[in-house]
């Protein structure tokens, strides 16, 4: 309910069913579900119990609605454990397995596929491309230590999560302009991939609002589609989006032309 993009919120059973059916019909390859917003600029922290309840209830409904793989967006080990007990396929950790010390053990036990985001608990002051590569390498080392092969891992450069300041513990602090950081990363996706699949999430995000001077995320569709197309042309393998049909059509058209 705290998500920055209000149209993506589905609380009731019927709204979840409708949202999942719509995404599947529009061509989604998997469903990503979260129980707590981690947007750096919002005060959205909820208890582990609340996050877990939301995730468990949503996953059960989604599993009854579709056979698509399910990704759970959490950095809490206890929440991941409950989701994996239900048969969830993917854990999407915005902190790259670095926030909760118990997360690697849960990952080792259940052996899921992983989406690992670039993240540091310490401030990043150096070259953003090199630093992002290093953060990826550290997360890959953690995954390797619990016997998760690279073939089960996708990397995410955490667009929107590198900031000078924030209101939670899920972002990486930097001493430079966050919009410039995000644009630099998106311009140079191939240079940070480490020969790994790369997932990019730019849908309706703040940097688009900054570029277009559109404060309301719901007004950022055109900017989102442009950014998503460029991401794919620049080397992204997976796009996490709120707008499945529009995104697929834009990317399909761009790939044919390019």
Predicted regions and their residues:
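Active-site loop-to-helix "anion-binding N-cap" substructures in soluble metabolic enzymes
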Residues: 28-30, 74, 106
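Acidic/histidine-rich, metal-coordinating catalytic segments
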Residues: 158
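Active-site-adjacent loop and "lid" segments of alpha/beta metabolic enzymes
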Residues: 3-22, 38-57, 61, 77, ...
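Short acidic capping loops at alpha-helix termini that bridge into adjacent secondary structure
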Residues: 149-152
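Catalytic domains of carbohydrate-active enzymes, especially glycoside hydrolases
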Residues: 18-34
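His-Asp phosphorelay/catalytic-motif detector in bacterial-type signaling
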Residues: 66-67
């Amino acid at each position: 309910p705290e998500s920055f993009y209000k149209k993506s919120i589905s609380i009731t059973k019927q709204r979840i069913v409708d949202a999942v059916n719509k995404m599947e019909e529009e061509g989604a390859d998997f469903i990503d579900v979260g129980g707590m917003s981690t947007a750096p600029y919002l005060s959205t922290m909820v208890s582990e119990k609340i996050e877990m309840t939301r995730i468990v209830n949503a996953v059960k409904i989604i599993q009854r609605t579709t056979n698509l793989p399910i990704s759970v967006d959490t950095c809490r080990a206890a929440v991941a454990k409950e989701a994996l007990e239900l048969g969830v396929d993917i854990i999407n950790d915005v902190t790259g397995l670095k926030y909760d010390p118990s997360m690697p053990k849960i990952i080792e036990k259940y052996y899921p596929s992983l989406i690992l985001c670039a993240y540091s608990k310490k401030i990043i002051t150096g070259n953003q491309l090199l630093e992002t590569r290093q953060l990826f390498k550290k997360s890959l080392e953690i995954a390797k230590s619990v016997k998760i092969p690279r073939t089960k891992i996708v990397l995410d450069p955490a667009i929107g999560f590198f900031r000078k300041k924030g209101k939670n513990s899920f972002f990486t602090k930097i001493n430079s302009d966050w919009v410039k950081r995000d644009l630099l990363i998106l311009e140079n996706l191939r240079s940070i991939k480490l020969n790994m699949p790369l997932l990019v999430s730019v849908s309706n995000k703040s940097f688009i609002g900054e570029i277009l001077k559109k404060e309301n995320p719901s007004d950022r569709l055109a900017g989102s589609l442009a950014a998503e197309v460029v991401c794919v042309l620049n080397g992204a393998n997976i796009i996490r989006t709120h707008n499945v049909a529009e995104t697929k059509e834009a990317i399909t058209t761009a790939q044919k032309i390019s």
